[in-house]
């Protein structure tokens, strides 16, 4: 008799994805972040659902409904802070996951990589709309500034912005539709993640060497299930330390002031995980140019498979490319820091240099390094 997990139509899918899946024997902890992203998504959907039960998406009551959740709802404060800081953990895992893909050449799986880019854009859109919902000062002005960027589109820009706003400024209609989108998008993300996994399992996982591991596979369970559980416990530990000891560490104090269209905060800035893109946007003096650079800062990931010049897939045995990769990481950290600083010297110049370096590294220096390494190895 065949085991039920191998014959049952539903259990068979779970079995082939998480139990009997043949996995490379040498994948490191950098491969843990896919499962951690799944855990983050489930946690965000669950906490978000409970928050939505008490939240009201009306400009007059949104701010006080969030205060009500924290003060009067049973364990509302922990649900709210798990959701807010869970988003930060989500992005930490996302950026590490993308970085892992860059370092080890996982972008060679084109379908998986491209759906990953779509997922990244969708998660960023969801997080942006979620930040608007508490209707604090930074929520309101962040929404105003970012949506206003669309007005840089020639001819249709202004009409497009007013269409998104549902009026002539960010108001009740905007908040209402942002809440609706913020509620539905995580389910779309879950569906896309399923497709992401589907395409990954067509090819099987990459591994640190970048060489085919077909001759040396081990079952996913128990080896990688136990490894993923350890990763999950560490993620939950860090999240709980953040939530229980300094829940507002990554937030903006301005968001504890109710939204006021008549009073602009001195420094409008998004959440920390968007600061690198915000710094790139601000470093270009032209509005349309800035918007294009902002979009390209993420969309550039789609061109990476085309820019791969090395005859080796992974960077594991490519020291020049490794140096450039870690320079890119340092550059992104610099951009993140600059994004949170006021627009004044020397920050303007640092931001411009870091932005140029970001695009130069990906478009020019890394492909050139691949060619040089091929010559060094006489390939």
Curated annotation (Swiss-Prot):
PROSITE patterns: CYTB_CTER, CYTB_NTER. Binds 2 heme b groups non-covalently. Heme b b566 binds at residues 97, 196. A ubiquinone binds at residue 201. The chain crosses the membrane at residues 33-53, 77-98, 113-133, 178-198, 226-246, 288-308, 320-340, 347-367. One of its GO terms (molecular function) is metal ion binding. Pfam families: Cytochrom_B_C, Cytochrome_B. It is a multi-pass membrane protein. GO terms for cellular component: mitochondrial inner membrane; respiratory chain complex III. It comes from the Eukaryota. Its main location: mitochondrion. It is found in: Mitochondrion inner membrane. Heme b b562 binds at residues 83, 182. Its cofactor is heme b. PANTHER family: CYTOCHROME B (PTHR19271:SF16). The cytochrome bc1 complex contains 11 subunits: 3 respiratory subunits (MT-CYB, CYC1 and UQCRFS1), 2 core proteins (UQCRC1 and UQCRC2) and 6 low-molecular weight proteins (UQCRH/QCR6, UQCRB/QCR7, UQCRQ/QCR8, UQCR10/QCR9, UQCR11/QCR10 and a cleavage product of UQCRFS1). This cytochrome bc1 complex then forms a dimer. Component of the ubiquinol-cytochrome c reductase complex (complex III or cytochrome b-c1 complex) that is part of the mitochondrial respiratory chain. The b-c1 complex mediates electron transfer from ubiquinol to cytochrome c. Contributes to the generation of a proton gradient across the mitochondrial membrane that is then used for ATP synthesis. This is Cytochrome b. The gene is MT-CYB.
